[in-house]
């Protein structure tokens, strides 16, 4: 079964964007390419056990096993050695990406305290959107009793849009709650 949001994209988003930006070809309409979720754990240099919790939680949130990111070079001021684990990340594509985006927009973001919408200024100039989350507990997959420390994460939504206006229109029609 295809993801619910993929059907929404094909039936509602594509016609709306084609009308708004007057695309001549359906393939020119912007679409979600991938979603990258990254957790940076600077404290993992002192305590390596913190990394295990982050990897497990990110795996539960994303639905696939994360990759552990390692330091590319040593920095003495940060007490960091080359090759030391400093974070973890996941790249989602296809149905998993649509399911995660659906959960993010409809379940997780509304659970943020005092949530009034996400900023529309976090585009990079090429239609890609980045958002930071301070607490992983907004996702329903995380069991509150098993969390040792709250961890934030960066979520980067990569689209095929050429401009920020196209990217904003794409995400807005797919249900992303932008601040007015």
UniProtKB/Swiss-Prot annotation:
Pfam hit, one: Ribosomal_L5
Q: What Gene3D superfamilies does this protein's entry cite?
A: 3.30.1440.10
InterPro entries tied to this protein: Ribosomal_uL5, Ribosomal_uL5_bac-type, Ribosomal_uL5_C, Ribosomal_uL5_dom_sf, Ribosomal_uL5_N
In the record, what lineage is assigned to the organism producing the protein?
Bacteria, Pseudomonadati, Acidobacteriota, Terriglobia, Bryobacterales
Q: How does it assemble?
A: Part of the 50S ribosomal subunit; part of the 5S rRNA/L5/L18/L25 subcomplex. Contacts the 5S rRNA and the P site tRNA. Forms a bridge to the 30S subunit in the 70S ribosome.
- Recorded family membership: Belongs to the universal ribosomal protein uL5 family.
What protein does this entry describe?
Large ribosomal subunit protein uL5
Q: What does the UniProt record say this protein does?
A: This is one of the proteins that bind and probably mediate the attachment of the 5S RNA into the large ribosomal subunit, where it forms part of the central protuberance. In the 70S ribosome it contacts protein S13 of the 30S subunit (bridge B1b), connecting the 2 subunits; this bridge is implicated in subunit movement. Contacts the P site tRNA; the 5S rRNA and some of its associated proteins might help stabilize positioning of ribosome-bound tRNAs.
């Amino acid at each position: 079964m295809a993801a619910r949001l993929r059907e929404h994209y094909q039936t509602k988003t594509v016609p709306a964007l084609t009308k708004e930006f007057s695309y001549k070809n359906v393939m020119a309409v912007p679409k979600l390419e991938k979603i990258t979720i990254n957790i940076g754990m600077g404290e993992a240099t002192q305590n390596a056990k913190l990394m295990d919790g982050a990897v497990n939680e990110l795996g539960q949130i994303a639905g696939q096993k994360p990759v552990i990111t390692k330091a590319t070079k040593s920095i003495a001021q940060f007490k960091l050695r080359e090759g030391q684990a400093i974070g973890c990340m996941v790249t989602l594509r296809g149905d998993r990406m649509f399911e995660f985006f659906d959960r993010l927009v409809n379940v997780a973001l509304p659970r943020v305290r005092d949530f009034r919408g996400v900023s529309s200024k976090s585009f990079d100039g090429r239609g890609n959107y980045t958002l930071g989350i301070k607490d992983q507990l907004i996702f329903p997959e995380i069991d509150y009793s098993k969390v040792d420390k709250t961890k934030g994460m960066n979520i980067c939504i990569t689209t095929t849009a050429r401009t920020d206006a196209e990217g904003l229109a794409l995400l807005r029609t797919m249900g992303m709650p932008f601040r007015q």
